[in-house]
Amino acid sequence: MADQRQRSLSTSGESLYHVLGLDKNATTDDIKKCYRKLALKYHPDKNPDNPEASEKFKEINNAHGILADSTKRNIYDKYGSLGLYVAEQFGEENVNTYFVLSSWWAKALFMFCGLITGCYCCCCLCCCCNCCCGKCKPRPPEGEDQDIYVSPEDLEAQMQSDERDTEGPVLVQPASATETTQLTSDSHASYHTDGFN
């Protein structure tokens, strides 16, 4: 068994039709009739001493399961057993995407874009490093101040002067709530300061 060569995946999509003895443009009813006829002929209960009949029955069941399902049949007709394998791995809705992305022109486009961007380094620099280390950085609109560099010492001095300008800390705390405290008061609280009434 270990020496046996693994079966390669076909892309023609014809071998399942040959298992049932049909051609590619067979209808669903034709598939059903041929399946029933062959399933009765090779059923393991009718051939208990024949292991080849059991294997043939498994192949017939597999072929019927794929060809009776319209989605799987379309994938098989278009891409063969390789398409069924891809559908099993990535989902039936992603089969077309897989084959488009694995086509020669998609690979060539990917390699061309990688080549002209220096292995996609420029794409990373544009997103992460503000366009080629700032050389191609978009200019701010007229009238807006440009970002200027502020040294840490100047920033610290500004923070200290802001702290000196403010008054002392707020020392008055709100009254603590007790069981007799009303949850809603009749008077409306005002959040205005004296200068903005």
Curated annotation (Swiss-Prot):
Quick one: a GO cellular component term?
Answer: plasma membrane
Chain intervals for the UniProt region annotation (Disordered): 153-197
Pfam families of this UniProt entry?
DnaJ
Q: Where is the composition biased (Polar residues)?
A: 175-197
The subcellular location is:
Cytoplasm, Cytosol; Membrane; Cytoplasmic vesicle, Secretory vesicle, Chromaffin granule membrane; Melanosome
How does this protein lie in the membrane? Lipid-anchor
GO biological process assignments: chaperone-mediated protein folding; regulation of synaptic vesicle cycle
Domain J: start-end pairs:
13-82
Tell me, in one coarse class, where this protein mainly resides: cytoplasm
Main role?
May have an important role in presynaptic function. May be involved in calcium-dependent neurotransmitter release at nerve endings.
Q: What is this protein called?
A: DnaJ homolog subfamily C member 5
Supply the source organism's classification: Eukaryota, Metazoa, Chordata, Craniata, Vertebrata
